[in-house]
A protein has these predicted regions:
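Substrate-binding/active-site clefts of carbohydrate-active enzymes
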Residues: 1-110, 115-141, 158-159
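Conserved alpha/beta catalytic core and glycan-binding cleft of carbohydrate-active enzymes
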Residues: 128, 132-234
Length: 234
């Protein structure tokens, strides 16, 4: 879960407003350092959830200090961050430095990138590709293995393809459709996006292939959805 500072003392962390500040009710950055060291001492890697698609609505003062947000796009949770508009170079660098901060200063081993489908960016050098390049370069400098894991509901193989093969270079991708298959089978729920799932064969496909919808028709979306992940290691 994300640890960025948020209003109050209890929260899932997805409306954090100070990306570099560890939530004080968790013990701040000193407590995070202790947790990471304790995990490493017993051979556990630490994966941190980070949110680079929006900031929370309460206590968010970044807008007062620069063009961090854009009105060209809108996320389900509020204003989108400015990754491809005027003065966006500085905003991109701010969030890349945030990723490097968790890796360098806190010893984090992997970052789970929240809802990258809500990172809107039409630039020729996508922010996510620049982020992946920067993180992998830093990992090489440190002689460490550091991974990026994207949450993405687009079923798009380009997220995890290497940049040399036309992708973004993210190391792995969250498999939401595996979850949806398991949930629908165990609960029988058919509302919302669960209406697209419910069979054992779909669960097998999600497990073996990464996701279910690879270009075929999705009843919920009423369109063909996704592309084939053939050739990508599961």
């Amino acid at each position: 879960m994300p640890v960025a500072e948020f209003p109050g003392s209890r929260n899932w962390g997805y409306d954090g407003v100070y990306p570099f500040a560890v939530e004080q009710s968790y013990g701040g950055v000193a407590a995070l350092h202790r947790l990471v060291r304790a995990c490493h001492d017993i051979g556990l890697a630490v994966v941190l959830d980070v949110v680079y698609n929006h900031l929370g609505p309460e206590g968010n003062y970044l807008r007062d200090f620069g063009p961090y947000f854009t009105d060209r796009y809108r996320t389900p949770w509020g204003d989108a961050l400015n990754f491809d508009g005027p003065d966006s170079d500085h905003i991109r660098r701010y969030f890349i430095e945030n990723a490097l901060y968790w890796i360098d200063d806190c010893g984090i081993d992997a970052l789970r990138l929240d809802a990258v489908h809500a990172i809107y960016d039409k630039s020729a050098y996508p922010f996510l590709q620049e982020l992946a390049d920067s993180v992998h370069d830093r990992a090489a400098e440190l002689g460490r293995n550091v991974y990026l894991i994207a949450e993405c509901d687009l079923n798009d193989w380009r997220v995890v393809r290497s940049a040399s093969s036309g992708g973004l270079g993210i190391d792995a991708q969250w498999s939401d459709e595996f979850h949806h298959c398991v949930h629908s089978l165990l609960t029988g729920e058919t509302s919302g996006y669960y209406a697209d799932f419910g069979s054992i064969s779909q669960l097998a496909t999600a497990f073996q292939e990464g996701w279910v919808y690879r270009g075929q028709y999705s009843p919920v979306r009423r369109m063909r959805f996704g592309n084939s992940p053939d050739g990508i290691q599961g």
